[in-house]
Amino acid sequence: QLRYESIWETVRDCNIVIENLKGRNSEVAAGTLAAAFSIKGICYFNLLRSWCQPWDNDLADELPGIPVVDVFDITAKPLRGTLRQTYEYTDEQFRNALALNPSDKTYIFTEWIIKAYRARLAFWCCDWDRAEEICRDIIENSGYSLTPISGYEAMINSKYDASGEVLVRSHINNSSELDWYFSYMKGYLSSRPACASLIRLYGDNPEADVRYAACFDRKRMNVKTPECKVRLSEIVLMLSESLYHLGDEEGALRWLNELRRNRIEGAEDLAAATLPAVRKGDRIVVDALGNPVTPLLQAIFDERRKEMFMEGDRWFELKRNGRPEWWVISNGLKYTTRKYLYTAPISKDDIDLNPGLEQNPGYVY
């Protein structure tokens, strides 16, 4: 609830900046305006992922989206649009930012960072053609390249720097409050061993994969710095999966092997004919379109799970691909993850203030 309210406060601030800087021609105004459009787009992307049901091509014009708030007006009570309207509005924010040709790193949100978020948005909304186009643009023209094995651990566990293939990341200054928070979180996350199903993905020789030593100690405890990052590895993985959904399995496999060669010492390229059969008992059994997982898609999911560990990705992968249900026992009680729980509830304060606002399924106040 607090995060939901905090995001809307940021949208409000962005709208104030946008309203007051539109039409100004100075470089400072353009840079600030591009940053405001970018931040607003990211806010809507996060609202879309967390407070809307996962994308469904057949229901995108019916499922509730996020209210469009285009101006600062404390008296307005906008209702939720559709999922498709939210996608289009969010993409519009990124396009508005790109139209200002942002290049000054002072404002953080430069062309390639904005395009990376736009690719994430298209990928989440199963717009495979757009996701492929943007990912290729970033890979071919941004100047970023996959960090090789030799530089991976330094890149992935850098304390402050966005080094190597990292386009942008959290915790980029040495604020004492942030230092304390990240130290606390790293300690907390190191108190539980990683899931055995994740460890098994590394096979019989896990040390050959540079990600293993960069992420785990001998007791399977996490040692990876828990940061939010936008990296070229994610762009490559999105490109691979987009190509898969577009029917270009050869291209999907080619990009997957490109990533593996930069992560696994002596990696042998995967071949379509010899990919392992789909495992039984995995959480994800269907893809984003509801189709059964195939050996190639399983291979893409496996590399993504290893690559994006501790970067806030796994929950959204589960939500995007079928919202699997499962249960655990804790202190003698059974806790079940239901499908509806993948979508967070709209803030009760907003519902009370605006009774016409539709609550997400499964939640009753």
Report each predicted region and the residues it spans.
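Outer membrane beta-barrel transmembrane domains
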Residues: S183-M185
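Short, cationic low-complexity segments
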Residues: Y188-I199
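Acidic/polar-rich alpha-helix caps and helix-coil junctions
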Residues: L2-W180, Y202-Y365
